[in-house]
């Protein structure tokens, strides 16, 4: 991206490009949260959206240090490449990392393990960590184009004392005026990337030369098909007897638990190739590759009502 792509002069006015306008909006939201709340935290999964969000947060306060920690809710069923990228990024940026482990809640008897996916258990661990650390705001990397429940959620999304979201009782948001009012025990989820699309995310990754986990690009992997989705063979996820293992060139469009994240056949090995592929896609990444969203027609909304990301 060149300077002329970012800033144009039109009839005596300087105008930001679409991508730089999204960046400015996200940075404004991040700074607004930092100014308005006492103990914010940035939720970080190691996926492309949370990496872009962290990049924006660091940029928002440069040359100073990030004034809030980063938190990863660790199910224990992560892709190795994602954990490696997380640790490298934390070391490079110098941010403070808080890791909330689902395994700790299993060991303490606070939750009962669900087989094979621990995805539903993340909500309890997330809310426990927010409560124990007394966080009053949590940044999330959700985008409105991903899924219909996320499409109707506000940028500042209120959570009650139980961490629950009520989609029928959302606060009005006029222009860039955000209402963060809450009482003790309640908190706000803030979504700086609400108005971004998957195409915008990848365009920004290319423009800013942001490093991602290698699984976002084409690679050879042993997979099997289940319910029309390609799933990776892993120690936490094995095929059934009627599901043959095949080796394909694939990449991941979104990153979650090994047990519920599918991949797509692809030869896109560079950012520009992924951008070209994304431009012609007619399915969102969650719709195409997330088994956890297929639990029911309202699977995401039901989980968000309980306190999910």
Curated annotation (Swiss-Prot):
Query: InterPro entries in the record, alphabetically?
Result: PAPS_reduct_dom, Rossmann-like_a/b/a_fold, SO4_adenylTrfase_ssu, Sulfate_adenylyltrnsfr_sub2
Q: Upper taxonomic classification of the species?
A: Bacteria, Bacillati, Actinomycetota, Actinomycetes, Mycobacteriales
| Reaction catalysed by this enzyme | sulfate + ATP + H(+) = adenosine 5'-phosphosulfate + diphosphate
Q: What does this protein do?
A: With CysN forms the ATP sulfurylase (ATPS) that catalyzes the adenylation of sulfate producing adenosine 5'-phosphosulfate (APS) and diphosphate, the first enzymatic step in sulfur assimilation pathway. APS synthesis involves the formation of a high-energy phosphoric-sulfuric acid anhydride bond driven by GTP hydrolysis by CysN coupled to ATP hydrolysis by CysD.
The protein's GO terms of the molecular function aspect are:
ATP binding; sulfate adenylyltransferase (ATP) activity
Alphabetically sorted, this entry's keywords are:
ATP-binding, Nucleotide-binding, Nucleotidyltransferase, Transferase
BP GO annotations:
hydrogen sulfide biosynthetic process; sulfate assimilation
Gene of this entry = cysD
- Stated EC number for the protein is 2.7.7.4
One Pfam family assigned to this protein is PAPS_reduct
Q: Which organism is it from?
A: Mycolicibacterium gilvum (strain PYR-GCK) (Mycobacterium gilvum (strain PYR-GCK))
- Enzymatic class: transferase
Q: What is this protein called?
A: Sulfate adenylyltransferase subunit 2
Q: Which family does it belong to?
A: Belongs to the PAPS reductase family. CysD subfamily.
Assembly description: Heterodimer composed of CysD, the smaller subunit, and CysN.
Q: Does the keyword Transferase apply?
A: yes
Biochemical pathway: Sulfur metabolism; hydrogen sulfide biosynthesis; sulfite from sulfate: step 1/3
The answer to keyword Transferase applying to this record is: yes
